[in-house]
Amino acid sequence: MAQTITSLADLKQGPGAEPAGLSAEPQEPKLDKEGRAYATGKRKDAVARVWIKPGSGKIIVNGRDLGVYFARPVLRMMINQPFSIVARVDQYDVMCTVSGGGLSGQAGALRHGISKALTYYEPALRPALKAAGLLTRDPRVVERKKYGRAKARRSFQFSKR
């Protein structure tokens, strides 16, 4: 009998292939020897290396507590955003090292790294984090300074006479 073709993806696969988007087995979590998920997050010039494991919700940044390293509540809320979106608040311990950039960029890198590590630990959380835009690396960086100008776009003061 002829196989029914319902989409362009089915046509590309050829005969006897499994339909697109359907996998037989669920994805396995990517864990190290100690049972932690590792990921890196980036934002502007900041790079965060993140390890997560099940625990009480403690977050350690560069050997210091989250509240000590990030004093502004907005930054702490930004870092905890991945956990609140997938309803996993106070279920994972996070240990991370952050370098480069300023505090805002570091918080963004940390949020990106935590989101990626959560998807490695629980692959089922990926659609929710992807829909919230937390798995996408923010490509916005500082525009470079051009010669003949004061800054990236600001010109030197012009005098007619």
From Swiss-Prot:
GO MF terms listed in the record are: RNA binding; structural constituent of ribosome
Q: Which PROSITE patterns match?
A: RIBOSOMAL_S9
Q: Which GO terms describe its biological process?
A: translation
Q: Keywords for this entry?
A: Ribonucleoprotein, Ribosomal protein
Q: Which residue ranges does UniProt annotate as crossing the membrane? A: none
Give a yes or no for keyword Ribosomal protein in this entry: yes
Point out the coiled-coil segments of this chain: none
Gene3D superfamilies the record matches? 3.30.230.10
Key word DNA damage present in the record?
A: no
Q: Which Pfam families match?
A: Ribosomal_S9
List the biased-composition ranges (Basic and acidic residues). Answer: 27-38
Q: Where is this region: Disordered?
A: 1-38
* Cellular component, GO, one term: cytosolic small ribosomal subunit
- NCBIfam families, per database record: PRK00132.1
Under the heading PANTHER family, the entry gives: RIBOSOMAL PROTEIN S9, SMALL RIBOSOMAL SUBUNIT PROTEIN US9M
Q: Can you tell me which family this protein belongs to?
A: Belongs to the universal ribosomal protein uS9 family.
Name by which UniProt lists this protein: Small ribosomal subunit protein uS9
Organism from which the protein derives: Rhodospirillum centenum (strain ATCC 51521 / SW)
